[in-house]
């Protein structure tokens, strides 16, 4: 079954206690906590270690995961869905396949879990599986894919965003719509995709005049939106969600260009990675840490943006896979500590990232259904400074 607990309601702690209690059952041999990406893997490990030091086993690769499975302990095994999938495909006869195991999936709305679940049923003989999600996939927002219930079974418990708002665990969303330039309104409000040629749509949305106008709007309104009217040391920071890598590049360059003469410049950073299927349906794309598949143009821009970051913070990150992972982790810390004012993203950080200092999300991107809730929920944490 699955547990529907809204983002910001303490889902990580609930899932940890569920995993911890499962390890204490005599009938259970192994407990897996499965996340979608290495960033969530790292965050979960840190969170679990905070709750209970030495309670979990993590791994850097499939071989490490295999080693952890051979250990005779009752620690929770934290792994990514990718590592688990690779292990199942490569290893045909592991002892764990015949053991009694529990799988707890975090953010189980993600598309990859459907494939993984099928592979698990092929290999594991005795298992229980539970999914945690803040945004379940229902038939009306499945976009032709499987629903959360079709993969995990029935809903076991629900604590929705309405419950969290009533209990004052999260903040309400305040949404402001801004028409930047009237000449572009028709393209921004057109709902019938058949009336638009994709190339023309992209060309219009990335038009230099539009990019410039939106960049000026963000810079002009940043202090008011983030409550920094009385100085940069107070208030919050912001995220800017854009449609694709090309948009991230254009906005990064234009924002820095427009503020070049400002006395107090925003510290702007960006992060993205390769996503083979650019989302047009309002879902947030699942970006991994693989940068090798990027186009040379995208990689060149990312390298420059990381270089700017290195210059500002006296760091030494790069676009190779390990350097990129370290950049991600350092960037996450600096966003949480408000050392970064504005973070431009395509898909990364829009799900599973918890930063109470973040109160504003600028959006120039198609978001629908659970994609909206996931993205907006980056801003509704309660922060007691």
Question: Model-derived features: where do they sit?
Answer:
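Signature of the SF2 helicase/ATPase Hel1-core->accessory helical subdomain module
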Residues: 85-92, 96-199, 212, 350-385
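Conserved RecA-like ASCE P-loop NTPase motor core of nucleic-acid helicases/translocases
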Residues: 4, 29-37, 234-244
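Short basic/glycine-enriched coil/helix segment immediately N-terminal to the Walker B
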Residues: 70-73, 88-101, 323-328, 332-340, ...
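Conserved C-terminal RecA-like helicase domain
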Residues: 202-342
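Conserved SF1/SF2 helicase motif Ia
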Residues: 14-40
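Inter-Walker segment of RecA-like/P-loop motor cores
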Residues: 49-89
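Walker A/P-loop
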Residues: 1-18
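Conserved helix-turn-beta segment of the N-terminal RecA-like "Helicase ATP-binding" lobe
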Residues: 23-24, 38-63, 257-263
């Amino acid at each position: 079954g699955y547990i529907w607990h809204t983002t910001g309601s303490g889902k990580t702690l609930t899932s940890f206690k569920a995993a911890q209690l499962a390890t204490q059952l005599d009938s259970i041999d192994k407990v897996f906590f499965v996340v979608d990406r290495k960033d969530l893997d790292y965050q979960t490990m840190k969170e679990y270690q905070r709750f209970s030091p030495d309670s979990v086993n993590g791994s850097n690769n499939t071989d490490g995961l295999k080693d952890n499975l051979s250990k005779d302990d009752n620690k929770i095994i934290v792994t990514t869905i990718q590592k688990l999938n690779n292990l199942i495909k490569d290893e045909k006869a592991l002892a764990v396949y015949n053991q009694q195991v529990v799988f707890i999936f975090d953010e189980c709305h993600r598309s990859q879990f459907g494939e993984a679940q099928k592979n698990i049923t092929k290999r594991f003989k005795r298992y229980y599986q539970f999914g945690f999600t803040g945004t379940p996939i229902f038939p009306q927002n499945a976009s032709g894919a499987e629903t959360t219930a079709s993969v995990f079974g029935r809903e076991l418990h629900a604590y929705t965003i309405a419950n969290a708002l009533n209990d004052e665990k999260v903040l309400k969303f305040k949404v402001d719509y801004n028409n930047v330039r009237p000449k572009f309104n028709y393209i921004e409000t057109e709902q019938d995709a058949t009336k638009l040629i994709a190339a023309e749509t992209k060309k219009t949305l990335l038009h230099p005049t539009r990019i410039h106008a939106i960049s000026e709007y963000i810079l002009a309104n940043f202090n008011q939106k983030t409550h920094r009217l009385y100085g940069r040391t107070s208030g919050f920071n912001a995220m800017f969600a854009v449609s694709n890598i090309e948009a991230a590049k254009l906005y990064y360059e234009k924002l820095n260009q427009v503020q070049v003469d400002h006395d107090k410049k925003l510290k702007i950073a960006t992060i993205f990675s390769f996503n083979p299927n650019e989302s047009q349906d309002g879902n947030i794309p699942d970006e991994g840490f693989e940068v090798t598949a990027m186009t040379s143009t995208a990689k060149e821009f990312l390298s420059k943006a990381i270089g700017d970051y290195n210059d500002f913070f006296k760091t030494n990150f790069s676009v190779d896979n390990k350097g990129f992972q370290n950049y991600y982790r350092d960037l996450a810390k600096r966003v949480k500590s408000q050392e970064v004012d504005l973070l431009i993203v395509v898909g990364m950080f829009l799900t599973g990232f918890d930063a109470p200092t973040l109160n504003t999300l600028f959006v120039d991107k198609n978001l629908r259904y659970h994609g909206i809730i996931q993205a907006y929920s980056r801003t509704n944490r309660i922060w007691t400074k």
